[in-house]
Curated annotation (Swiss-Prot):
<keyword id="KW-0808">Transferase</keyword>
<dbReference type="InterPro" id="IPR000608">
    <property type="entry name" value="UBQ-conjugat_E2_core"/>
</dbReference>
<keyword id="KW-0749">Sporulation</keyword>
<dbReference type="GO" id="GO:0061631">
    <property type="term" value="F:ubiquitin conjugating enzyme activity"/>
</dbReference>
<dbReference type="GO" id="GO:0000209">
    <property type="term" value="P:protein polyubiquitination"/>
</dbReference>
<keyword id="KW-0539">Nucleus</keyword>
<keyword id="KW-0805">Transcription regulation</keyword>
<protein>
    <recommendedName>
        <fullName>Ubiquitin-conjugating enzyme E2 2</fullName>
        <ecNumber>2.3.2.23</ecNumber>
    </recommendedName>
</protein>
<keyword id="KW-0833">Ubl conjugation pathway</keyword>
<dbReference type="GO" id="GO:0033503">
    <property type="term" value="C:HULC complex"/>
</dbReference>
<dbReference type="GO" id="GO:0006325">
    <property type="term" value="P:chromatin organization"/>
</dbReference>
<dbReference type="GO" id="GO:0043161">
    <property type="term" value="P:proteasome-mediated ubiquitin-dependent protein catabolic process"/>
</dbReference>
<keyword id="KW-0547">Nucleotide-binding</keyword>
<feature type="active site" description="Glycyl thioester intermediate">
    <location>
        <position position="88"/>
    </location>
</feature>
<dbReference type="GO" id="GO:0005634">
    <property type="term" value="C:nucleus"/>
</dbReference>
<comment type="similarity">
    <text>Belongs to the ubiquitin-conjugating enzyme family.</text>
</comment>
<keyword id="KW-0156">Chromatin regulator</keyword>
Length: 151
């Protein structure tokens, strides 16, 4: 069945193949364009550098009018990532726009890695360390980077 959501997702996939943003990749799982696997490489010159972080994206038929559900599968220690892997990111909630595509979502998440929003933390411990003990925060982040290589 061809729906506008599926057509849009196929356009998003084509863009990811022809004009991939640096440090991110994504593609639909076999036989289901509504679920995607994605990878974000930790940005250079940040504590997340060289990490390979896996995510899953779930789209509903209302996409692009409704944002996808996005969740880290890789362990992530970050102020805006819940223990479940779900993200607290404004563009995936109240600041969503149908103009955002998969590439824009993933690059926004990649930017969030080194520029967390500590005013509304999903992980209070990570937020407190980021604010009050940056050395320990970086140590914990580097541990998740090393774990990302094993996955």
């Amino acid at each position: 069945m061809s729906t506008s959501a599926r057509r849009r997702l196929m356009r998003d996939f084509k863009r990811m193949q022809t004009d991939p943003p640096a440090g991110v990749s994504a593609s639909p799982v076999a036989d289901n364009v509504m679920t995607w696997n994605a990878v974000i490489i930790g940005p250079a010159d940040t504590p997340f550098e060289d990490g390979t972080f896996r995510l899953v994206m779930h789209f509903e038929e209302q996409y692009p009018n409704k944002p996808p559900g996005v969740k880290f599968i890789s362990q992530m220690f970050h102020p805006n990532v819940y223990g479940t892997g779900e993200l607290c990111l404004d563009i995936l909630q109240n600041r969503w726009s149908p103009t955002y595509d998969v590439a824009a979502i993933l690059t926004s998440i990649q930017s969030l890695l080194n520029d967390p929003n500590t005013s509304s933390p999903a992980n209070v411990e990570a937020s407190n360390l980021y604010r009050d003990n940056r050395k320990e925060y970086i140590k914990r982040v580097r541990e998740t980077v090393e774990k990302s290589w094993e996955e």
